[in-house]
A protein has these predicted regions:
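Predominantly flavin-linked oxidoreductase catalytic cores and closely associated redox partners
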Residues: 123-196
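Aromatic side chains
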Residues: 48, 96-98, 153
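Beta1-alpha1 glycine-rich phosphate/pyrophosphate-binding loop at the start
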Residues: 2-72, 161-186
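Short beta->alpha junction loops/turns
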Residues: 11-12, 39, 94, 129, ...
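FAD-binding core/adjacent interface of flavoenzyme oxidoreductases
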Residues: 1-7, 32, 66-147
Length: 196
């Protein structure tokens, strides 16, 4: 069993921030971050993989950010949390005991199951897994037309980046305008004109 003062489950933005802030606030305690992938994507940079960057490796959060702060990193999928005994077990049967636990496992995309065809081949929700994102990158090389569902910040960024590669992109938003949650109508009208 591995012992740590603070165990953080999740190695993306929330987990990294939690571990880093704990290091600053509590000094020399033992901190361990468990994540389920070897590499962690910069979440807000994911759309740029498909245009500006052309690869996932340029969108990886460096482990050095944590290791330089003497934060331990472990790769594994947590399958059990025993809050009474303050232990966590991974799929590989590694067990960690902790004094404090932070669960920062991130978000998942909303799948619009009300749209017929959402389960078909070549429909890709965006997950933060590097291998999965690489598979999408490879698939994009073989297509000419791309539909992006969702006209919020991420959808608009995806549409813009993919269009930079010469693909015909259709951006679909169920509201009256893209980016409507962040800007007023006059501004969203201007944005839509620019996107066309």
């Amino acid at each position: 069993m591995k012992k740590t003062d603070l165990l953080v489950i999740g190695g993306s933005a929330g987990g990294i921030l939690s571990a880093s802030m704990a290091r600053k606030a509590y000094g020399d305690i033992d901190i361990t971050v468990i994540r389920d992938t070897d590499a962690v994507m910069v979440p807000c940079g994911i759309p740029y993989i498909y245009g500006t960057l052309h690869c996932t490796s340029k969108n990886v959060i460096p482990d050095k950010m944590l290791t330089d702060s003497k934060i331990n990193l472990a790769v594994g999928t947590v399958v059990k949390i025993d809050k009474d005994n303050k232990t966590v077990t991974t799929k590989n049967n590694d067990t960690y005991s902790y004094k404090k636990l932070v669960i920062a496992t991130g978000s998942l995309p909303i799948i619009p199951t009300f749209i017929p065809g959402h389960e078909l081949e070549n429909v890709f929700p965006i997950y933060k897994n590097q291998d999965y994102l690489n598979a999408i990158l490879e698939k994009l090389e073989t297509v000419e037309n791309v539909a992006v569902i969702g006209g919020g910040f991420i959808g608009v960024e995806f549409a813009e980046q993919i269009s930079m590669t010469g693909k015909k992109v259709t951006l679909v938003e169920m509201a009256d305008a893209c980016l409507w949650q962040a800007f007023d109508k006059s501004f969203t009208d201007d944005i839509e004109k620019m996107m066309k």
